[in-house]
Amino acid sequence: VFCRFNGQQCTSDGQCCYGKCRTAFLRMICMGG
């Protein structure tokens, strides 16, 4: 399973390497860590 880094767009299930999938700039991106 691949994951997305901070600043990359994510899906509602939140496949982020670290941090969480949050709404920003009218889209979902990975933020935090």
Swiss-Prot record:
Entry comment describing in which tissues the protein is expressed: Expressed by the venom gland.
GO (cellular component) term, any one: extracellular region
Pfam families in alphabetical order: Toxin_29 (PF08116)
Major place of residence: secreted
Disulphide connectivity of cysteines: C3-C17, C10-C21, C16-C30
GO function term, MF aspect, one: toxin activity
Compartments where found: Secreted
InterPro entries registered for this protein in UniProt: Toxin_29 (IPR012634)
Keywords: Disulfide bond, Knottin, Neurotoxin, Secreted, Toxin
Stated role: Acts as a neurotoxin.
Similarity annotation: Belongs to the neurotoxin 17 (21C2) family.
Domain notes: The presence of a 'disulfide through disulfide knot' structurally defines this protein as a knottin.
Name assigned to this protein: U13-ctenitoxin-Pn1c
Organism the protein comes from: Phoneutria nigriventer (Brazilian armed spider)
